Amino acid sequence: MHEVGFPLDLSVFTRLIATLFFLAVGVFYFLKNTAAKYFDIGAAAAGGFDRDFMAVDAEDCSVCGNFSTKKCSRCKSVRYCSAECQRSDWSSGHQRNCRDYGITTLTPSAKNGLRFRASPFGDSSASSIALISERGQNKSSLKPREVLFPYEEFVEYFNWDNPELAPCGLMNCGNSCFANVILQCLSWTRPLVAYLLEKGHKRECMRNDWCFLCEFQTHVERASQSRFPFSPMNIISRLTNIGGTLGYGRQEDAHEFMRYAIDMMQSVCLDEFGGEKIVPPRSQETTLIQYIFGGLLQSQVQCTVCNHVSDQYENMMDLIVEMHGDAGSLEECLDQFTAEEWLHGDNMYKCDRCSDYVKACKRLTIRRAPNILTIALKRYQGGRYGKLNKRISFPETLDLNPYMSEGGDGSDVYKLYAVIVHLDMLNASFFGHYICYIKDFCGNWYRIDDSEIESVELEDVLSQRAYMLLYSRIQARSSSSCLRSEVKDEKKTDTLDTESCVKELVESSMVGAIESRSSTHATIEDPVCEQSPSPSPSPSPSPSPSPSPSVLASECCSEVERIDTLDSESNSSIDDSATDHQEDVANGNKDPEVKYQAADSWSDPTTSTPLVCTKSKPPVRDMDTKMIDAQ
């Protein structure tokens, strides 16, 4: 007798159940990790703490003091070794103080697309998902700020002083001397160190991934507290994150690493306000990093045919100076940098006014000097053994006023505080060793060779064959808005030119209308409709913004209409006056060169103020100023 039904193999069924169980567990953990990555869980309600806000780090636990690998992902300041310690600290008061430590749960993440919103009923387990895109909400709702960092606060950091700080050596992690010297120079850049030690960046950081400024703050804090050399592996191991072409274990250029580091810090500052694509170019110049290293170069080109002058501005973070000919000092190199250059031959300049390639004179100057001036001497030329090893003397006090666009006001004076030297063999440019000389906040100079520190005199520093020089202004810039005033002046000049063009068009139409109205009218050249002042005294009006070209056109057109609508009596009086004027000229009673102003006999039927048409030339603009914003 056959059994009815599907035959069941117990071993196959067991394996199937086990497989389904492991698949379910895998899918569960996958969804859990995905949710933890893309959602912020808010449990700040009064119900208590039942979520683990953890992030990887390496500090001591704030509860038991053991080695910790996690931290609170809200404030990013308190660290724990386990979830039990975090729950204990949460219930003992961290729940109330977490907001004061740093970022709260309501702060939008810079990366997460969605977030969890805490339940209004006080039960943290009943948290609900707020299906609102944080990224899209930030871009559409955040209003662009004109000033990202207060300049007055920067001036306080610039004048900050801490004489107790002493230099600390850094261990060489394998061809990392190029990074060690830059980290030493940045660690003794006064406004940057003052900001990291006094205010700090970690609590305000909006990044969920690796942040160079956060790591550099940890580096500065450790260097200020340590008496022994330590390894900067937290930064060296992330060279590819700092610069795409940098690599761990390879010999790299110190100047290139510094450029990457400054650009990375600038990018971090912009991320706090939405990123480089959202922040306007003008506001990008108001970050802390721009206040420290940012300046402005002016490139001026003058046409030799029409004398047309064109100015272009470019943002600068450092100054790369070449060593041409017999230049033996930094001042001579700067003279060559700002010297006039003739554009001719195959390098002719295309003039916008001439619309042709012409011979021109070009000069590059400094429009706005930075607070921290970084000068890189271009010692490397073509070839593997093409390094220029000649000594270039440099002063302790550098006066930058002779190299400014407008001669300077005497305040662009700098003091030397760091020197980077590249040691090589046989003028090789592909290998060598970097050392640096640093001046502390008390004025003492030190020679730092990785982990070795030696006190030196100023004469030893000035005798070196420097590769990079770092100068600090004696006094911070008085204002950071000089570029904006220039742009405002440019816009005002452009507006005047536009108004003049509109006036010319209106004037030509007025002349045509008057001539067509009456052929016996007196001669009128290029009239510009104005109103003569009223004889009765009146209080001076308050200044008002200049009218737009459309308003000017409408006003002048209204004057034309009023002229065209003159009655026959006014026309006859004008004809009679013109006839009398011709008779006087014929009899010799009047000078024929004097133009009779027929408008004197015109009157507005609606007002007692007479209308006067006078000769007025539009302003001619010889300067075409352009602005190049650094991206």
Curated annotation (Swiss-Prot):
Q: Which reaction does it catalyse?
A: Thiol-dependent hydrolysis of ester, thioester, amide, peptide and isopeptide bonds formed by the C-terminal Gly of ubiquitin (a 76-residue protein attached to proteins as an intracellular targeting signal)
Membrane topology, as annotated: Single-pass membrane protein
Q: List the disulfide bonds.
A: none
**Sequence segments annotated as region (Disordered):** 518-631
Where, per UniProt, does this protein localize?
Answer: Membrane
Membrane-spanning residues? 10-30
User: EC no.?
Assistant: 3.4.19.12
Residue span(s) of domain USP: 168-474
Name the catalytic site residues.
C177, H433
User: Under which name does UniProt file this protein?
Assistant: Ubiquitin carboxyl-terminal hydrolase 18
Species per Swiss-Prot/TrEMBL record: Arabidopsis thaliana (Mouse-ear cress)
What gene is it encoded by?
UBP18
